UniProtKB/Swiss-Prot annotation:
The system is composed of three essential subunits: KdpA, KdpB and KdpC. GO terms for molecular function: ATP binding; P-type potassium transmembrane transporter activity. Part of the high-affinity ATP-driven potassium transport (or Kdp) system, which catalyzes the hydrolysis of ATP coupled with the electrogenic transport of potassium into the cytoplasm. This subunit acts as a catalytic chaperone that increases the ATP-binding affinity of the ATP-hydrolyzing subunit KdpB by the formation of a transient KdpB/KdpC/ATP ternary complex. It is found in: Cell membrane. HAMAP family: KdpC. It comes from Kineococcus radiotolerans (strain ATCC BAA-149 / DSM 14245 / SRS30216). Belongs to the KdpC family. This is Potassium-transporting ATPase KdpC subunit.
Length: 196
């Protein structure tokens, strides 16, 4: 056999062996390892679904609509109608887009009217959708600005509703990453069980 043919066969064997090792490692070992780690923390690996009376009502990780003035409202969604998770994504409108500016002004007027505040007092995250369009959190400022509306609609004192907001405010991740947040689903579930 010629030297060129021997080298070609050796390289082909090496390439085939690399393909088999990569297929086994990335197609079997890695997925099984991720699955095993997920089984160690099943509540976190299964989407953090929240159940009430055995029925799933939402996920701590995905925003959803709460129609009615008696509920805290999440950020606006760019994910289709009704927080459609299959349409998750940003609006892709730039900061100088007239469509974005028009949407922000419409949201500002609607939120100000619903919460009974001046348009300049609307929290910034009540005006813009998150990158995914399905953010389950609002800022503590946004939640606090909704307290009066929610308290009046539910017949609760503003102090009681404000205390629920404070109880459900989470600090920065690791103490320094990101901003404090309020999970809207968790807050609304606590609100649901709050006695007037």
């Amino acid at each position: 056999m010629s030297l060129a043919l021997t080298n070609l066969l050796r390289q082909a064997r090496t390439g085939l062996l690399l393909l088999l090792v990569a297929t086994a490692g990335l197609g079997l070992v890695y997925p099984l390892a991720v699955f095993a780690v997920g089984r160690l923390v099943p509540a976190r690996a299964d989407g953090q679904v929240v159940a009430v009376d055995g029925q799933p009502v939402g996920s701590r990780l995905i925003g959803q609509e709460f129609p009615g003035e008696q509920w805290f409202q999440p950020r606006p969604s760019a994910a289709g109608d009704g927080y459609d998770p299959t349409a998750s994504g940003a609006s892709n409108l730039g900061p100088e887009s007239t469509d974005l500016l028009k949407a922000v002004e419409e949201r500002r007027a609607a939120v100000a009217a619903a919460d009974g505040t001046a348009p300049v007092d609307v929290a910034p995250d009540a005006l813009t959708a998150s990158g995914s369009g399905l953010d389950p959190h609002v800022s503590p400022e946004n939640a606090r600005r909704q307290v009066a509306r929610v308290a009046a609609a539910r017949g609760l004192s503003e102090q009681r509703v404000a205390a629920l907001v404070a109880e459900h405010t989470r600090g920065r991740a690791l103490g320094f990453l990101g901003e404090p947040t309020v999970n809207v689903l968790e807050l609304n579930l606590a609100l649901r069980s709050a006695a007037p």
